[in-house]
């Protein structure tokens, strides 16, 4: 009995340091506050307005509009309004053999002063050769030009194309025209036109 009491006292004596060790207060943690991070983002860019309307009040496209909606407009019948910027004229032949001239074609743009060829739209297919145009213009000036019967399916030869004219064209917007011309951004295979502003008439 005495020996058991001694063993209990020894066990309690050994446990005292352990209890004191567990009861010691923990070391205080130092929490350091990080500085506030201010985001350095670029300003939201202001997008400029489109240079020209997609379509006009009469439903015709601008050249800008045709090409900005290329997926929807390519290989479709369209109407497009623009100014005639340049008309192809075959070069004069001074020495034989003469090179075969290109088929008649012209370029239109959204403004009269547009000088970037990439912003011009080629119009093709309104005549087979320059002789057809010259003859039709001569007859028209004499009041004797008669357009072909619509039942024939032949298109009238345009006689009022002048650089500076504002014209609404109708035709097939395509990458490859019937006259052998091609353009990856599209060209117009002519079907018809109406002249909105005629500079030749204004000069008279």
Q: Predicted segment positions?
A:
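Sec-dependent bacterial lipoprotein signal peptides
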Residues: 1-20
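OB-fold and OB-like single-stranded nucleic-acid-recognition modules
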Residues: 22-204
């Amino acid at each position: 009995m005495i020996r058991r009491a001694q063993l209990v006292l020894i066990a309690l004596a050994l446990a005292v340091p352990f209890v004191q060790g567990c009861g010691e207060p923990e070391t205080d943690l130092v929490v350091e506050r990080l500085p506030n991070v201010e985001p350095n983002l670029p300003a939201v860019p202001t997008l400029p307005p489109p240079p020209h309307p997609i379509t006009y009040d009469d439903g015709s496209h601008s050249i800008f509009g045709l090409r900005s909606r290329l997926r929807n407009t390519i290989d479709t019948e369209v109407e497009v309004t623009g100014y005639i910027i340049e008309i192809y004229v075959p070069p004069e032949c001074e020495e034989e053999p003469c090179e075969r001239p290109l088929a008649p074609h012209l370029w239109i743009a959204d403004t009269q002063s547009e000088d970037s060829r990439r912003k011009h739209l080629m119009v093709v297919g309104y005549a087979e050769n320059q002789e057809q145009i010259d003859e039709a213009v001569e007859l028209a000036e004499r009041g004797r030009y008669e357009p072909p019967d619509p039942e024939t399916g032949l298109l009238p030869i345009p006689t009022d194309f002048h650089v500076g004219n504002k014209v609404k064209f109708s035709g097939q917007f395509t990458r490859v025209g019937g006259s052998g011309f091609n353009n990856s951004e599209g060209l117009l295979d002519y079907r018809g036109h109406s002249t909105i502003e005629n500079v030749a008439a204004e000069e008279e």
